């Protein structure tokens, strides 16, 4: 087989926020459909996956904007520090007392609880007067983060991620096409090699 000499010019860019947001979108729609059909078996696991994807997608979107807008962007900076840097750069007041930015902290805390998955041991020893029904409602074996596995928080988190993303993207003056994965290549023939 004859060899040829060519010049390859290639460029690719991958922005993982798209994949994470697509996963969040998938889970969000699946959860809504399942709840509409009263199909609740294992839905909390899908809520956990959805909220995790939303938290990761939001951070990836912030990293994307930081990468595009802020010189020497540090994607390893703390989560909330990065959000504050990007919002400041784009002239947005970061108010974590109200939505949608209140949700950012809740998602960050949720994410941090699950990853890296630190063990928690709690002990309690006391006598109480209660009813059997009250004992069952205590949720003693329920972790704090599990309270966020509910339809309303999933809806709010997904909606707030979209609100934040659309607002920041609009303010950034970047086009939607700037956010997509892509690339290209050209091959230029130089000569035959014997």
Report each predicted region and the residues it spans.
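Charged alpha-helical initiation segments
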Residues: 1-47, 193-194
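Amphipathic, non-membrane alpha-helical segments in soluble helical-bundle scaffolds
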Residues: 10-21, 40-51, 55, 97-104, ...
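Surface-exposed polar/charged interaction patches
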Residues: 30, 34-37, 68, 89, ...
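A contiguous binding-surface segment within folded domains or other stable secondary-structure elements
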Residues: 74-97, 105
């Amino acid at each position: 087989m004859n060899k040829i000499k060519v010049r390859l010019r290639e460029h690719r860019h991958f922005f993982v926020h798209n994949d994470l947001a697509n996963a969040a979108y998938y889970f969000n729609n699946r959860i809504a459909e399942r709840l509409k059909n009263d199909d609740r078996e294992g839905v909390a696991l899908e809520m956990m996956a959805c909220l995790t994807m939303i938290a990761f997608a939001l951070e990836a979107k912030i990293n994307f904007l930081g990468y595009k807008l802020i010189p020497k962007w540090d994607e390893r900076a703390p989560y909330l520090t990065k959000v504050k840097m990007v919002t400041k750069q784009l002239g947005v007041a970061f108010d974590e007392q109200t939505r949608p930015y209140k949700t950012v902290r809740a998602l960050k805390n949720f994410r941090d609880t699950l990853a890296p998955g630190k063990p928690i041991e709690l002990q309690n020893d006391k006598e109480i007067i209660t009813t059997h029904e009250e004992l069952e409602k205590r949720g003693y074996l329920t972790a704090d983060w599990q309270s966020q596995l509910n339809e309303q928080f999933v809806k709010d988190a997904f909606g707030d991620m979209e609100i934040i993303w659309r607002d920041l993207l609009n303010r950034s003056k970047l086009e939607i096409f700037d956010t997509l994965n892509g690339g290209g290549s050209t091959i230029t023939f130089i000569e035959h090699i014997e």
